[in-house]
Design a protein with these regions (language model features):
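Extended surface/linker regions that mediate inter-domain or inter-protein docking
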Residues: 1-186
């Protein structure tokens, strides 16, 4: 048996924040390193989306003609220009682990995950007020949105209309590490 050197785990290396987001922090007068320290201390991270109206052309199962409600910003597929869906909020859901069947006094072993609207008290404390439902962030006129979320927690999200009805529901779960500022272009 020979010992072989294993490559370092890339997920353990520090993530870098994209230059465009670094510029936004600088313009707002926020020291990015101090902000990331604050996030780490509170076991939080930031998820930012540059343009929620932009979708993957290969996704034909979800609505893809999206327009920011009350604004002209939209992304329309010229081959299929209708219908157009107005979106107003991005709503995050967190995976809560619940005990299996059996009741409170005699629970059976095991846990199951269930999606619940974001309710982590620390994350909710530091997010700005929203006009949307629980766990929502307003979509800005340029199509961008950002939210402080709990780190080390499985998260998913959906885009909702002005009545908080889900329009685009993501079918994947992600998690972040404390202090991370993660950006998605669409």
């Amino acid at each position: 048996v020979r010992v072989r050197q294993r490559p370092s785990n890339p997920t353990l290396q520090l993530e870098t924040v994209a230059p465009s987001e670094q510029a936004l922090f600088a313009t707002a007068g926020v020291n990015l390193k101090n902000f990331q320290k604050f996030l780490r201390r509170n076991n939080l991270s930031v998820l930012a989306i540059r343009d929620v109206t932009s979708r993957d052309d290969a996704d034909q199962q979800q609505p893809f003609n999206l327009k920011v409600a009350g604004n002209n910003h939209q992304t329309i597929n010229p081959a299929h220009p209708a219908p157009i869906y107005e979106i107003k909020h991005v709503q995050f859901l967190q995976n809560d682990l619940l005990r299996g069947i059996g009741g409170i006094n005699t629970p059976k072993a095991g846990r199951r995950g269930i999606a619940k609207f974001l309710h982590d008290p620390t994350a909710m404390l530091y997010n700005p007020p929203t006009t949307g439902a629980q766990g929502s962030a307003n979509i800005h006129p340029d199509g961008s949105a950002a939210m402080i979320v709990p780190a080390k927690r499985a998260l998913t999200w959906q885009l909702t209309d002005a009545n908080n009805k889900g329009i685009v529901r993501e079918r994947l779960w992600i998690s972040t590490k404390a202090g991370e500022v993660r950006t998605c272009t669409s």
